[in-house]
Amino acid sequence: MTMNGIPVKLLNEAQGHIVSLELTTGATYRGKLVESEDSMNVQLRDVIATEPQGAVTHMDQIFVRGSQIKFIVVPDLLKNAPLFKKNSSRPMPPIRGPKRR
């Protein structure tokens, strides 16, 4: 079983939302996040690509290798994602030891 960190879990929560990627080459991609993997590989749909020189291109879909991603911008609404909530619904542990009178 693999242990996923917060960034990978957040990326999984962002599936179905519009995200922006900046690559190590300086290119940026903005589109709907279709799929993300534990290795940070992502698939985007309805993508607007902007090259470092400023050329803008529209693509139906694109797959980006995680090692080529410099950073990812996710929607602000994900700051309220369940993975950031404290698990306050856990019951208090029982009191142990002899009963006091």
UniProtKB/Swiss-Prot annotation:
The keyword RNA-binding applies. Keywords: Cytoplasm, mRNA processing, mRNA splicing, Nucleus, Ribonucleoprotein, RNA-binding. Residues 6-78 form the Sm domain. Gene3D superfamilies: 2.30.30.100. Belongs to the snRNP core protein family. Coiled coil: none annotated. Its main location: cytoplasm. One of its GO terms (biological process) is mRNA splicing, via spliceosome. The keyword Acetylation does not apply. It is found in: Cytoplasm, Cytosol; Nucleus. GO terms for molecular function: mRNA binding; RNA binding. It holds the Pfam family LSM. Plays a role in pre-mRNA splicing as a core component of the spliceosomal U1, U2, U4 and U5 small nuclear ribonucleoproteins (snRNPs), the building blocks of the spliceosome. Also binds telomerase RNA and is required for its accumulation. The gene is SMD3. GO terms for cellular component: catalytic step 2 spliceosome; commitment complex; cytoplasm; cytosol; nucleus; precatalytic spliceosome; Prp19 complex; SMN-Sm protein complex. Component of the Sm core complex, present in spliceosomal snRNP U1, U2, U4/U6 and U5. The core complex contains SMB1, SMD1, SMD2, SMD3, SME1, SMX3 and SMX2 (Sm proteins B, D1, D2, D3, E, F and G, respectively), and is probably a heptameric ring structure. SMD3 specifically interacts with SMB1. Signal peptide: none annotated. This is Small nuclear ribonucleoprotein Sm D3.
